[in-house]
């Protein structure tokens, strides 16, 4: 139950939390940009404007798989660390936070 173990657990839980937010942000951005592209098409907008919005949509869409992969790697690392250190850190705030992050992200990879 060293301070280094607690710090490592806290950092990895923070990484998972940040990547989850990032994934949610990109998913919301894709939904927003998809709606914008459709709105431009429905309005008969200039093809250049439509193409520009499609490029923005493509960039956001391209970030989803990468972010999901990084989240899965961080999730697996955090899971392994919790299994390794769980008994020694039982009841600690860091362990509780790590377990909360695992529970929040686990449905994505189940």
Residue ranges and their predicted role:
Residues 1-3, 96-110:
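C-terminal helix/juxtamembrane-tail motif
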Residues 12, 16-19, 23-40, 60, ...:
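Non-transmembrane amphipathic alpha-helical segments
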Residues 20-23, 61-64, 68, 82, ...:
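A structural signal for well-ordered alpha-helices, especially hydrophobic packing surfaces
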Residues 49-58, 92, 96:
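Short, charged, amphipathic alpha-helical segments
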Residues 56-77:
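Amphipathic alpha-helical coiled-coil segments
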């Amino acid at each position: 139950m060293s301070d280094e173990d607690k710090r490592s657990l806290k950092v990895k839980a923070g990484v998972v939390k940040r990547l989850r937010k990032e994934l949610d942000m990109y998913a919301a951005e894709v939904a927003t940009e998809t709606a914008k592209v459709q709105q431009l098409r429905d309005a008969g907008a200039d093809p250049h404007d439509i193409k520009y919005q499609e490029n923005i949509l493509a960039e956001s869409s391209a970030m989803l798989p990468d972010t999901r992969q990084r989240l899965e790697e961080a999730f697996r690392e955090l899971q392994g660390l919790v299994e390794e250190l769980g008994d020694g850190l039982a009841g600690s705030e860091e362990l509780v936070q790590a377990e909360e992050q695992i529970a929040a992200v686990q449905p994505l990879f189940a």
